[in-house]
């Protein structure tokens, strides 16, 4: 008799490369009124979540990837007409499975690079030119997901760029909140979208967590100043990035880009020259090679090279 509480004729089919639709009929026997259903589903054999739906007969799984396998089952929630405080949960149906198809290609899968700069508080996205477009290229759409469960949420459209635009700057991002961004192209006149570009996943750090520490400058002779610093692990960025993929030093109006070191020597200076500099760190994620995170600049430090006479006098005293 317990099988009578199972939803009937449970089926699932792929509607397009990014959508699957599950349908069912009510159970053969209802213990009062059916007040809803719970769908348990997975993608590629990894259970993700349970979805509660109203007393409808269909549910759409959206924002899937092409060639992604969905496995789902469903159970009904019953409420006896004579006892509003009692709920009867029926038996789960046999799982059904479907795999989304490959898209009929309208252009090559797009790609982009993204850089977040703490000092500017913005994500700078540079989208590469579209390739192999079927028809006329109609522009790119930027999409984003945010939140602790951003992987489970639908992509939200941020902006539609014109066919000529390749750059977009995203502002107002919140520290310590997980984000994912991607793009897709549209072909005209069909208005069909391309596949989504490989997303970039990241979190915004607080400045004090990523800025270089213990920055110091010391003159070693009349023509040389050494600058040192520490790049402590970043509790936010380090989840995604290797510490200090590179550093940048600002000296007056000049910028120097260095490899992953913790010392730089300014040479060829004149005696009694004051030098001021600050430094930031460039983080490169391990899982998102097209993303770069630039920390805030450190406080400015200053050092002055001694005169030749000062050095000669000091050596004479020794």
Swiss-Prot record:
SUPFAM superfamilies: Fibronectin type III
Domain of life, source organism: Eukaryota
Pfam families: fn3
Keyword Repressor belongs to the record: no
Domain Fibronectin type-III as annotated: residue spans: 6-103, 109-207, 211-308
Keyword field contains Repeat: yes
Keywords for this protein: Repeat
Comment field (misc): ONCA and ONCB are the primary targets of protective antibody responses.
Protein name: Oncosphere antigen A
């Amino acid at each position: 008799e317990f099988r009578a509480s199972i939803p009937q004729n449970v089926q699932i089919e792929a509607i397009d490369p990014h959508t699957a639709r599950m349908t069912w009929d009510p159970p053969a026997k209802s213990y009062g009124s059916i007040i809803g259903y719970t769908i348990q589903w997975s993608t590629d054999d990894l259970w993700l979540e349970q979805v509660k739906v109203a007393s409808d007969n269909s549910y759409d799984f959206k924002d899937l990837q092409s060639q992604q396998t969905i496995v789902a089952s469903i159970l009904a929630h019953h409420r006896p007409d004579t006892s509003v405080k009692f709920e009867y949960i029926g038996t789960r149906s046999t799982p059904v499975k479907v795999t989304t198809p490959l898209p009929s290609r309208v252009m090559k899968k797009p790609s982009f690079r993204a850089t977040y700069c703490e000092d500017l508080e913005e994500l700078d996205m540079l989208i590469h030119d579209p390739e192999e477009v079927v028809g006329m290229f109609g522009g790119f759409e930027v999409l984003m997901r945010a939140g602790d469960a951003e992987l489970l949420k639908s992509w939200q459209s941020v902006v539609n760029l014109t066919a000529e635009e390749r750059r977009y700057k995203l502002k107002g991002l919140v520290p310590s909140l997980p984000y994912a961004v991607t793009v897709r192209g549209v072909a005209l006149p069909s208005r069909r979208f391309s596949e989504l570009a490989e997303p970039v996943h990241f979190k915004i750090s607080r400045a004090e967590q990523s800025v270089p520490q213990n920055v110091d400058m010391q003159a070693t002779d009349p023509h040389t100043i050494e600058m040192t610093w520490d790049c402590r692990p970043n509790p936010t960025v380090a989840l995604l990035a290797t510490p200090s993929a590179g550093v940048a030093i600002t000296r007056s109006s000049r910028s120097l880009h260095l490899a992953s070191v913790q010392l730089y020597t300014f040479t060829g200076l004149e005696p009694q020259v004051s030098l001021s500099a600050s430094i930031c760190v460039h983080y490169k994620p391990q899982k998102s090679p097209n993303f770069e995170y630039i920390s805030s600049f450190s406080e400015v430090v200053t050092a002055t090279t001694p005169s030749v006479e000062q050095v000669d006098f000091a050596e004479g005293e020794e």
